[in-house]
Structures are given as structure tokens and as C-alpha cells.
Amino acid sequence: PTQLYLSEKKLQDIQMLYQSAETIQVDPISILAFGDCLLITDGHHRAYQALLAGRDTISAEWDRDGGDELYHLYAQACEERKIYSVLDLKNHILPQDEYEAKWYNWCDGFNQAVTLLLKRKADEIGPTNR
């Protein structure tokens, strides 16, 4: 995973979809290759709910939006917190307002720190070595 929390509300909305139809049509999740693993970049809630519903497959598509380096860092942050699978987010399900506050604040801070580090790294390389 590349996400630290799940929203209780989003999970409930997806669960309603699973309960309301025999043939469930949910958007595919987005993934990136990272070493020998696949990282979810979008669709953590859908993947979590699919696993809870007993599904062993889910539709996925390659994430072509860029930001691969950043997602790899997000995945490392998850691993540091012992989040190796979307099922590991079971104890990280929050009410919607708390989810938004914690997750979006964390992302903003993390992204700013990474941007500064990458800029510093580029400055150290200097224009002659680029």
C-alpha cells in the first residue's frame, strides 16, 4: 500500500455497492511496479472491501500519472509502520473527518519534505554533473 489510513465512510459506500448488486462494477484500482511487488496508488478502499467480500481478484490498471518516486517513498513509510497489505489497514480505519485531517495533513507534510530533499539533492549534483 501507499496509504496509511482508510475512511470508514468510503468503506461503507463501497460495501453498499457490493450488497446492492449481483454483478459489481467498481472502477479498477491503479498500480505501479516496485521491485517484485505491485503498489496500489489509487483504490485502497476498493481493494480492502473486495478482500473482505472474499474476492481473490480485482480489476487493475497501470498508473501512468507519474510520481513513481514519490509512491515508492509512500510505500516505504507504510512498511516502516508495518503496513504491508491493505488488510494491515484494518486498525487504521477512521471517521471521515479524522481521515481527511490526518491523511491529507500527513501527505502535505511528507510531499513538502520530499520536495525539499529532492531539490537539495539536485543542488548537490550541481549543473555540471546533471
Enumerate the predicted regions with their spans.
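Short alpha-helix boundary/capping and kink motifs at helix termini
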Residues: 1-41, 45, 51
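Basic- and aromatic-enriched surface patches that contact anionic nucleotides/nucleic acids
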Residues: 35-130
